[in-house]
Amino acid sequence: RLIIGSDEETGFRCVKSYFEHEEQPALGFTPDAMFPLVYAEKARATFDHKLEFKSEEGNFDYKLVKFNGGQVLNMVVASAEAVLKGEARDIEEKFDKFLAAEKLEGEVKVSDVITLVLKGKAAHGSTPQFGINAATKLAEFLNTLSLDVNGKNYVEYIATRLANDPFGKVLGIEYSDDEMGASTYNYGILKYDAAEKIGVISTDCRHPKNFDLVSKLATLKEDNMVIEVTSTKEAHYVPKDDELVTTLVDVYRKHTGDTKNDAFVLGGGTYARCLKKGVAFGLLFPGKQDTMHQANEFLEIEDLLLATAIYAEGIYRLCCE
């Protein structure tokens, strides 16, 4: 059976609805990852860091009016923007020096307000260590300025507790095991609005199946911040020695001659987790450029043809032998 989904990036509603009306296949695979094969996918949790606003007091040079970065949780923020009120003075020079030191791009726009824009590097939210989070970088710069108390509390928390730490070490929520690897944290949607008293950092965590993240988060006591869990999803796991896994890996090796790479665990989520017994099988080959979730995403034609041959034999081996 060929099942075509249309909502993979935003909740799998399509496949969930399909299985409410149709019987699940006994087993299956999805071409939504990498070869040789993904036999397990980490658990996922999303949670918000929410700023507790205080009354304005003290002197400051700039007021943080707005701060925005990211549109979806499962991508590293590629562009972020901050709006300030205050005298421009030498802020453009300071920002240019910061960008040069970090080897990043951005710009300053001055009108009745000061707008700072910083460009990072997108990556999949399950591997934030491979991207450059524009929002946390912009917060690092803003943290060097004299800001109003709420703006300062917001950017200081990001700059000192979250920035450059995709594994949660600073907050004390790091965890890893030998089979599923390390927990990762992507700060994917950040929004601050002084007028509406909104200061939120929405986070996407991928973690091993044996880590109780919710209980760990409940123990955190962060100044000026409240942490609220918004969703959880259990890990997906098919034993590595299951016949589904060993058969498909054998087909892959027959067609590629690759005996070095083996089935592995993925931080990302695929349609495989919608099946009681499903795996992600290709179709990015080892050593090939991964442009997933980036501008100009592409696949080489010869890889598509090779993958097609692998899939054809894989389906035959699973269904006809």
Per-region residue spans from a language model:
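Short glycine-biased active-site loop of nucleotidyltransferases that positions the nucleotide triphosphate
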Residues: 18, 38-41, 74-76, 270-274
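Short, solvent-exposed loop/turn elements at beta->coil junctions and helix N-caps
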Residues: 35-36, 68-72, 264-268
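Short, internal active-site loops enriched in acidic
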Residues: 6-10, 121, 268-271
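An extended, acidic, His-containing surface patch that forms the Zn2+-binding/catalytic region
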Residues: 126-198, 202, 206-214, 226-321
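Acidic/histidine-rich catalytic neighborhood of metal-dependent amide-processing enzymes
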Residues: 1-54, 165-179
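Short acidic, glycine/proline-rich loop/turn micro-motifs
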Residues: 13-14, 77, 291-294
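Short, well-ordered beta-strand elements
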Residues: 3-4, 118, 200-205
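Acidic-enriched catalytic cores of C-N bond-cleaving enzymes acting on peptides and small amides
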Residues: 40-42, 46-121, 125-185, 213-224
